[in-house]
Regions:
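Bacterial N-terminal signal peptides
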Residues: 13-24
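Ankyrin-repeat-protein effector appendages
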Residues: 32-47, 198, 232, 275, ...
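Conserved ankyrin/ankyrin-like repeat signature
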Residues: 58, 91-92, 124-125, 157-158, ...
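Ankyrin-repeat junction/capping positions
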Residues: 71, 104, 137, 170, ...
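Ankyrin repeat boundary/linker residues
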Residues: 74, 107, 140, 173, ...
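Ankyrin repeat domain, specifically the short helix-to-loop turn at the C-terminus of the second helix
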Residues: 63-68, 94-102, 127-135, 160-168, ...
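Ankyrin repeat A-helix N-terminal signature
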Residues: 49-54, 83-89, 116-122, 149-155, ...
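Start-of-repeat signature of ankyrin repeats
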Residues: 43, 77, 110, 143, ...
Length: 496
């Protein structure tokens, strides 16, 4: 297989290598014969190589010979008609067909001429193949059809031609995705229009994740597609019904609004609210103003939560988004109805947008929420205060969670000035000093002592049986991570 050539469309290199292993090229000596009848011989391979290079003079010369075989193939299965479809040569597709070329031939990867023409938007070639009777429902290894490929590429005329030829509108590839999903995710509104007019299934959802074409469009920020689907009657407040959560699957109850927010498509999110989306919907476990905290400052770990923060699309900054959402009815003090303290994690139930902003020591967001009317003293259902959250209560991944030492110190100062008690104890027997120890931030320990935290209030065991000293010496969820500087800071703080 010629890996120095452009690899076959739609096939990632990993797949190509895998298939190369599954279908090894046969090597034969000059005195041997191959059992593959149509495999091009050394003597006749020249014209087929010309077709690969889009030079059809050699093909024309070869066609004059009585021995010409229009279905000769290269080791990977590529034939002249496949190259004609790839290079958008409809006249050669017609000539080769007249010479006996199989229009439904496929490579070892089950790539047909029509799928090639559809994927590359080669309209004249695709229409020629359809007119000559090519199978419009051919499938690649992943069961991708020409309609899906054309929908993703965006040529609405090819999509229309395939529909008129009787293609199955709602055929599904191996992951359960349809042509409408591919068009919606790619933002090809013209293809979406044609598919909708033809009567495709708008409500089809993937079995595990519950994703629909509507949700794909929201996740990818495809505003034009969103508007077309709304005009078609999609419910702006519909949510996914997840059968198998975790990993890369979304949370159950995610709406298009939440997909847009968490993917960084903030202009689209505002547009959805203006079109009727509920700015206080928390069926996914969180509301838009809660989610903006991790859109601005990513979570932790080598997992989906630890992915880089999304790139904000459009011209709407995250803080301007918050302001507009509040103007459109978002409750700045909305308290979460779901959640629990899993292990040592912070309990989100009862948390407000300000509470989550404090958790990440996001000073700018905290200041804006205060300006918009946030109550800085609202605790979660465990009575964990914003001060405790900023200090580090709930931190399990040292050095990976949002908030630098400098940011945390500023947040602690702000929160105490706003009325948060540095000596408060929550229902899990946690204090702000326990949080500072969990972060391994000696600066936060000293700052809390400076702000009035006294050892009589914090030098005790939490629900897990750990004092701040125990935590600083390494007792914490996961691996042991002692911090001698934090231990020293706690010793200093205990003598205040």
């Amino acid at each position: 297989m010629r890996l120095n050539q452009r690899h076959l469309p739609g096939m990632g290199w990993g797949v190509v290598v895998m298939l190369a292993m599954a279908f090894p090229v046969m090597v034969v000596r000059a005195d041997q014969t191959t059992s593959t009848a149509n495999l091009a011989s050394d003597a006749s391979a020249g014209w087929l190589k010309d077709a690969e290079l889009n030079d059809w003079s050699g093909v024309a010369a070869a066609m004059k010979r009585n021995s010409f075989d229009a279905n000769q193939s290269q080791p990977d299965g590529m034939t002249a008609v496949l190259w004609a479809a790839y290079h958008d040569q409809p006249q050669w597709i017609e000539r080769l067909h007249a010479a006996g070329a199989d229009l439904d031939v496929s490579t070892q990867y089950l790539v047909s001429p029509l799928s090639l023409a559809s994927e590359f938007g080669n309209m004249e070639s695709a229409q020629m193949l359809v007119r000559l009777g090519a199978n419009v429902n051919s499938k690649r290894l992943g069961k991708e059809t020409p309609l899906m490929l054309a929908a993703r590429q965006g040529n609405a005329e090819i999509v229309q031609s395939l529909i008129e030829a009787g293609v199955d509108l709602d055929e599904k590839e191996t992951r359960g995705q349809t042509a409408l999903m591919w068009a919606a995710a790619a933002g090809n509104s013209g293809a979406v229009d044609v598919l909708l007019k033809a009567g495709c299934d708008v409500d089809h959802a993937l079995s595990a994740s519950g994703l629909t074409a509507w949700m794909f469009a929201a996740r990818h920020g495809r505003t034009d597609v969103i508007r077309r689907l709304l005009e078609h009657g999609v419910d702006v407040n519909s949510v996914v019904k997840v059968k198998r959560g975790g990993g890369r699957n979304p949370r159950d109850g995610m709406s298009a609004l939440m997909f847009a927010v968490e993917s960084g498509h903030l202009e689209l999110a505002v547009d959805l609210v203006r079109r009727g989306a509920d700015p206080n919907d928390q069926r996914s476990g969180y509301g838009p103003l809660h989610a903006i905290s991790w859109v601005r400052k990513t979570e932790r770990g080598d997992n989906p939560e630890g992915d880089p923060a999304p790139r904000i699309t459009g011209g709407l900054h995250s803080l301007a988004f918050v302001r507009q959402m509040v103007e459109l009815g978002a409750d700045v003090n909305l308290r979460l109805k779901k959640g629990s303290s899993r292990g040592q994690r912070l309990n989100p139930r009862g948390g407000t947008p300000f509470f989550l902003a404090a958790r990440g020591a996001d000073i700018e967001l905290m200041q804006l929420l205060l300006e918009l009317g946030a109550d800085p003293n609202l605790a979660n259902d465990d009575d964990t205060t914003p001060l405790m959250a900023a200090a580090g209560v709930g931190v399990i991944a040292v050095g990976e969670e949002p908030g630098t030492p400098e940011e945390v110190d500023l947040a602690l100062e702000m929160l105490v000035s706003l009325g948060n008690d540095p000596n408060a104890v929550d229902r899990n027997r946690e204090t702000a000093m326990h949080g500072a120890a969990l972060r391994n931030f000696p600066t936060a320990v000293r700052k809390l002592a400076e702000l009035g935290a006294v050892s009589d209030s914090w030098n005790h065991k939490n629900k897990r049986g750990w004092t701040p000293f125990d935590i600083a010496r390494g007792k914490r969820p996961g691996s042991v991570k002692p911090s001698p500087p934090t231990v020293e800071a706690l010793k200093e703080a205990s003598s205040f």
